[in-house]
């Protein structure tokens, strides 16, 4: 075969290989022309300004409940109407996360958050029993212990002067999740300069920066940059520590199992000590009930660490900010927290409404995205294979049809009007088959921590401060959460 013929053959083979992708991309372009949406220049300009959420809000007002955005060669169709979101989140076939979640894979691997398809189904079925309320109730004690440390640390700030409370909250959340997820005390609140604490903060910071940076998404280049090297160093610390704890906890479980009396095995497990999330996975592995490698276990523990740390920190901090500006709401929440002290596992209607209203205004996860693997019917649209869809929760929660005067903080919406809302008007924990597996855990931690903080302090606003929510992997305030606090006495009053 001549050189020319060989070159022609290679080019023809390459053409045939990429022809389906080319044809599908052309189909995506034709579909995109039927929907309104911004130019790539507008996207880049708003990313640089860091005002994605405000911009998306403007796009919703300009284009209506459905519009499209090109992220490079990736087409994303945005949905904000509760009926469309019901169709999307309730779809049992639409389970594959979009490319946005690939940013998390270096840390979380193919854990429950990033996985899809049959592998996700098996893992979800395996993990669900670990979030039974009876088991979750065991986690309340370490939540309280770590919140007491937070209360003590805040005493130095209880002088009525403004400060940023977010760093205090995030270290508390890290301590609480380390103890419930891995069964170890990290003392992040007391040793914030430890290697592990620094690594968690570093990886979250780098991933957040990557989330809306085009060039930082290209791993082939990113890994050679300073942030890329920072990420790799943090990953080594995090993975090494999780692997170390897995080995340690397995040895402890084997030793305890050897000491159990066969006829009392069930009771002795609970009597000896509280089981962490990691322990439950290790016991499943040891009993051979499912194929779980140490890497599988590490991925799920790291996933639990990420989801239970960043999202909880955001929710607590925003809740305290809103309560500081709404003293009547804060007083009602304080009275309920005082009346039900020690009974946070029970229903706390008003505090739960406060949490829901906080998550309505500042949802910890501002949007949920999925990859469309087959043509998808949504209302009157047919979204073509190869596109992605995004449920814009931040916009959904501001729909005046379900939430009149949507920027107003009003927990009574969830006490008086909740039954009148569209069932998918509020989706802070997602919904359908891929809803948040840890939402009961999150609510227990939020109720426990907020109740303890409200019983200890009165929260006052910094009148010069207004949080600037940023749409990163988790909604955060770009300028911190500044407020003032005063201590309460035994009667719940302040000086």
From Swiss-Prot:
<dbReference type="InterPro" id="IPR050196">
    <property type="entry name" value="Cytochrome_P450_Monoox"/>
</dbReference>
<feature type="binding site" description="covalent">
    <location>
        <position position="307"/>
    </location>
    <ligand>
        <name>heme</name>
    </ligand>
</feature>
<protein>
    <recommendedName>
        <fullName>Probable cytochrome P450 4s3</fullName>
        <ecNumber>1.14.-.-</ecNumber>
    </recommendedName>
</protein>
<keyword id="KW-0256">Endoplasmic reticulum</keyword>
<keyword id="KW-0349">Heme</keyword>
<dbReference type="InterPro" id="IPR036396">
    <property type="entry name" value="Cyt_P450_sf"/>
</dbReference>
<keyword id="KW-0408">Iron</keyword>
<dbReference type="InterPro" id="IPR001128">
    <property type="entry name" value="Cyt_P450"/>
</dbReference>
<dbReference type="GO" id="GO:0004497">
    <property type="term" value="F:monooxygenase activity"/>
</dbReference>
<comment type="similarity">
    <text>Belongs to the cytochrome P450 family.</text>
</comment>
<keyword id="KW-0492">Microsome</keyword>
<dbReference type="Pfam" id="PF00067">
    <property type="entry name" value="p450"/>
</dbReference>
<keyword id="KW-0560">Oxidoreductase</keyword>
<dbReference type="GO" id="GO:0005789">
    <property type="term" value="C:endoplasmic reticulum membrane"/>
</dbReference>
<keyword id="KW-0479">Metal-binding</keyword>
<keyword id="KW-0472">Membrane</keyword>
<feature type="binding site" description="axial binding residue">
    <location>
        <position position="436"/>
    </location>
    <ligand>
        <name>heme</name>
    </ligand>
</feature>
<dbReference type="GO" id="GO:0005506">
    <property type="term" value="F:iron ion binding"/>
</dbReference>
<dbReference type="GO" id="GO:0020037">
    <property type="term" value="F:heme binding"/>
</dbReference>
<dbReference type="InterPro" id="IPR017972">
    <property type="entry name" value="Cyt_P450_CS"/>
</dbReference>
<dbReference type="GO" id="GO:0016705">
    <property type="term" value="F:oxidoreductase activity, acting on paired donors, with incorporation or reduction of molecular oxygen"/>
</dbReference>
<dbReference type="InterPro" id="IPR002401">
    <property type="entry name" value="Cyt_P450_E_grp-I"/>
</dbReference>
<keyword id="KW-0503">Monooxygenase</keyword>
<comment type="function">
    <text>May be involved in the metabolism of insect hormones and in the breakdown of synthetic insecticides.</text>
</comment>
């Amino acid at each position: 075969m001549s050189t020319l013929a060989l070159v022609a053959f290679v080019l023809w083979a390459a053409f045939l290989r990429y022809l389906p992708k080319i044809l599908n991309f052309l189909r995506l372009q034709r579909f995109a022309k039927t929907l309104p949406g911004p130019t790539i220049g507008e996207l880049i300009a708003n990313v640089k300004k860091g005002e994605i959420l405000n911009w998306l809000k403007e796009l919703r007002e300009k284009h209506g409940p459905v519009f499209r955005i090109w992220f490079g060669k990736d087409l994303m169709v945005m949905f904000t109407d509760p009926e469309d979101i019901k169709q999307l989140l309730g779809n049992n076939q639409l389970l594959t996360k979009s490319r946005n979640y690939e940013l998390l894979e270096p840390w979380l691997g193919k854990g429950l958050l990033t996985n899809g398809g049959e592998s996700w189904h098996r893992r979800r079925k395996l993990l669900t029993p670990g979030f039974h309320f009876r088991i979750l109730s065991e986690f309340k004690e370490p939540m309280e212990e770590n919140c007491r440390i937070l209360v003590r640390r805040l005493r130095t700030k209880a002088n009525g002067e403004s400060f940023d409370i977010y760093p205090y909250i995030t270290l508390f959340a890290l301590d609480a999740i380390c103890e419930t997820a891995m069964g170890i005390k990290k003392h992040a609140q007391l040793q914030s300069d430890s290697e592990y604490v620094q690594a968690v903060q570093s990886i979250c910071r780098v991933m957040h920066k990557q989330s809306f940076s085009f060039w930082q998404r290209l791993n082939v280049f990113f890994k050679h940059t300073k942030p890329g090297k920072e990420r790799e160093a943090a990953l080594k610390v995090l993975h090494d520590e999780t692997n170390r704890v897995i080995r340690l906890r397995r040895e402890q479980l084997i030793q305890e199992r050897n000491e159990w009396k066969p006829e009392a095995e069930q009771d002795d497990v609970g009597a000896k000590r509280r089981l962490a999330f990691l322990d439950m996975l290790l016991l499943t592995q040891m009993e051979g009930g499912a194929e779980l490698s140490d890497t599988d276990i590490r991925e799920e523990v790291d996933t639990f660490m990420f989801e239970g740390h960043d999202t909880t920190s955001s929710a607590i901090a925003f809740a305290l900010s809103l309560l500081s500006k709404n003293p009547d709401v804060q007083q009602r929440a304080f009275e309920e927290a005082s009346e039900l002290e020690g009974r946070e596992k029970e229903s706390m209607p008003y505090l739960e409404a406060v949490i829901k209203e906080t998550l309505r205004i500042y949802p910890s996860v501002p949007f949920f995205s999925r990859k469309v693997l087959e043509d998808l019917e949504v209302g009157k649209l047919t979204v073509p294979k190869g596109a992605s869809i995004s449920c814009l929760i931040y916009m959904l929660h501001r729909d005046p049809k379900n939430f009149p005067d949507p920027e107003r903080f009003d927990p009574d919406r969830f006490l008086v009007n909740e039954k009148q809302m569209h069932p998918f008007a509020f989706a802070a924990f997602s919904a359908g088959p891929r809803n948040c597996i840890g939402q009961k855990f999150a609510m227990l931690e939020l109720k426990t921590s907020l109740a303890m903080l409200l019983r200890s302090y009165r929260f006052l606003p910094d009148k010069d401060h207004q949080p600037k929510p940023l749409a990163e992997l988790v909604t955060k305030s770009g300028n911190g959460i500044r407020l003032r606090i005063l201590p309460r006495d035994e009667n719940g009053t302040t000086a």
